[in-house]
Amino acid sequence: MAAITASMVAELRAKTDAPMMECKKALTEADGDLAKAEELLRVKLGNKASKAASRVTAEGVVASFVGGNAGALVELNCETDFVAKNDDFLAFSKTVAELVATQNPADVAALSALPLDGSTVDAVRLALIGKIGENVSIRRFVRFETANKIATYLHGARIGVIVEYTGAEEQVGKDVAMHIAAMKPVALSAADVPAELIDTERRVAEQKAAESGKPAEIVAKMVDGSVQKYLKEVSLLNQTFVKNDKQTIEQMLKAADAAVQKFALFVVGEGIEKRQDDFAAEVAAQVAAAKQQ
């Protein structure tokens, strides 16, 4: 059997970007034949990508891009916070955000089919899965195209905001975007709050008010008061400005002769159920897998 040297491992790693131990295993299996080892490794990485692509992705980043009269916000997911900080993953997320803004894909499927690096976005995504060993998915995106101004704000790459606004001061757009990230409104105004959210809040308020034992007319007023308070708390224009608790967002905008047309807020992993593994079960699974090898 041919001796596997460190330089051989380094050369194979440079060609494939595979982990060092994987390169050494492939070279050993190929009896030192670099070309054969590369082929074996590509097969293994393909299998690895296939397996990883079925796993839950609840971590990740939000990326943004603004250019010309268009802006985009994109959420990409991975499995661990460690990979969410990986340079290749971050670079891919920024590229995807730029593609959304400049190419205007209709949906994630159309985005995935766009050309990238001599291939497609999806092919690059699958190659990234093989390289880092975790599932990577493009979850969602939003794109604004307007003659108005666009502001974005990222908080630790886990919360992202994009705002369309009018007004002379760019700081206003930045302030509103930062406020949205902090206070997480669900709608621009009270009239825009989805009916299902209001219905849910009303049911909760009715149950609480009914427990008070007060007369029906008092209960009705209590419910209405609770709903109105909720609408004030979740609608952007009615919220108290985080940088000045003496003003609402609406008052701040009016003072600056500005207005917000729309916004979008992404929070990484929002609504995705994380897989919670039992440690003992995980060890048992690894032992069982080792016995089968």
From Swiss-Prot:
GO MF entries: translation elongation factor activity
Pfam family, one: EF_TS
Presence of keyword Acetylation: no
Alphabetized InterPro entries for the sequence: EF-Ts_dimer_sf (IPR036402), Transl_elong_EFTs/EF1B (IPR001816), Transl_elong_EFTs/EF1B_dimer (IPR014039), Transl_elong_Ts_CS (IPR018101), UBA-like_sf (IPR009060)
Entry similarity comment: Belongs to the EF-Ts family.
PANTHER family, per the entry: ELONGATION FACTOR TS, ELONGATION FACTOR TS, MITOCHONDRIAL
Biological role stated in the UniProt entry: Associates with the EF-Tu.GDP complex and induces the exchange of GDP to GTP. It remains bound to the aminoacyl-tRNA.EF-Tu.GTP complex up to the GTP hydrolysis stage on the ribosome.
Entry protein name: Elongation factor Ts
